[in-house]
Amino acid sequence: MDSSTATAMTAPFIDPTDHVNLKTDTDASENRRMGNYKPSIWNYDFLQSLATHHNIVEERHLKLAEKLKGQVKFMFGAPMEPLAKLELVDVVQRLGLNHLFETEIKEALFSIYKDGSNGWWFGHLHATSLRFRLLRQCGLFIPQDVFKTFQNKTGEFDMKLCDNVKGLLSLYEASYLGWKGENILDEAKAFTTKCLKSAWENISEKWLAKRVKHALALPLHWRVPRIEARWFIEAYEQEANMNPTLLKLAKLDFNMVQSIHQKEIGELARWWVTTGLDKLAFARNNLLQSYMWSCAIASDPKFKLARETIVEIGSVLTVVDDGYDVYGSIDELDLYTSSVERWSCVEIDKLPNTLKLIFMSMFNKTNEVGLRVQHERGYNSIPTFIKAWVEQCKSYQKEARWFHGGHTPPLEEYSLNGLVSIGFPLLLITGYVAIAENEAALDKVHPLPDLLHYSSLLSRLINDIGTSPDEMARGDNLKSIHCYMNETGASEEVAREHIKGVIEENWKILNQCCFDQSQFQEPFITFNLNSVRGSHFFYEFGDGFGVTDSWTKVDMKSVLIDPIPLGEE
């Protein structure tokens, strides 16, 4: 055991609020930058109350849900055509019920995959596309060549397909599962996007028009499953061929899972207000946003340890980020970083009180999470956390030096550092620690594997697209858009479009990584995909994470706070 590990395992926990009086903090009189973030719109007394007054699920609803689960299992076992089985799987997944029927879904998809030699889907656009998407999502490779039958001799898609809106929509969604170099899927994406944009206002079926509009705003593959489930439950209710059993179970299950999440939110809110970090005026106070992100990554109730530790580490991480970005001087940040590298509190008395508070909160919470993992999972994860924190803070330190030195790095240099500074290697490693098979498996995340590299790079670039206007106004650190503008002389509009193109290309690489990263168990692959989906949710239309009173508020409230009305039973 090295010295840093020994320190982590034996160091006493320190109450940072015993050592720092935020009201008389000597830092307050100094000329410090401010993040200018608005106060949180979420009432912490209310959030804490969710621990004991959450959405309680009635006993009769639990019994009804069990009955309906049995009926759905019977549906999976009943004889049906392959397309009907695919559509059942699709609806179950989109309703957010896949965590209840993991075995049935896998058996159904493997059966369809094995029976593919007879080509039952051939010439049927919807069937071909749905089969392609669901099997690739499941980790079963289907070649892009299955779509050649819909192209002419020059490789163009037949314009007659534009009349088949349902098939077009399925092909559109399937195209986002493509890999780099799969030109047929690139053509499919461009073709279906153009056709659907020109057709959706004239679609007679309201439910189909609603689905098309929703998909064009953001494809299914890029959406957060838990948020999508809430939207789809309401949309599915309006469909003519809606299955009442699936709909009723989806509503009940959504509320039951939400009840679990609400209890966790309440307990986490109680912890957060004891840290003192919520009182720092320059930093973001975003506990509920952090929980929303953990819920995006791992909403399944069985991932409680992953969710809670991601929120705890993530909430502290946000304040550490703001400390580097807007608060600390270079000398202070160098001392902070060296203390993280030593994983020691010995020299932090040389730091100003506020940075001391942040360091001790980070140190304590990380050691506390490590001890919890030791208790619940049976292995020592603290060395893994220390490595991740060191890389995290060194990336922040580099950005601070760029900022204070007035240096604009090339896009590639910025991106390699930025994929770490975005924080997702640390957060995803936190999630991985909660589900790893054993201590030896923790070595798989150092050095950073491609799966983590590309998911984190995507989150960095998506974040940059959404936050660059606000951060430019604050005079904050550079973003990829500015680096590209400086490197090439491009306008901001051209640079923004370039970064969007880079995002699309890196999604293709990440899609392939999901097949190539066989050293990881499936939940961790999904964690990575979901982390990028969370980035799309928070940053697709601006800074929905830093600005709490934004468009994200409605979805967060519907997913985390408001249960679905069940109506008459």
UniProtKB/Swiss-Prot annotation:
It comes from Santalum album. Signal peptide: none annotated. The keyword Glycosyltransferase does not apply. Its EC number is 4.2.3.82, 4.2.3.83, 4.2.3.81. It comes from the Eukaryota. Belongs to the terpene synthase family. Tpsb subfamily. Mg(2+) 1 binds at residues 321, 325. This is Santalene synthase. It catalyses: (2E,6E)-farnesyl diphosphate = (1S,5S,6R)-alpha-bergamotene + diphosphate; (2E,6E)-farnesyl diphosphate = (+)-alpha-santalene + diphosphate; (2E,6E)-farnesyl diphosphate = (-)-beta-santalene + diphosphate. Keywords: Lyase, Magnesium, Manganese, Metal-binding. Mg(2+) 2 binds at residues 321, 325. One of its GO terms (molecular function) is magnesium ion binding.
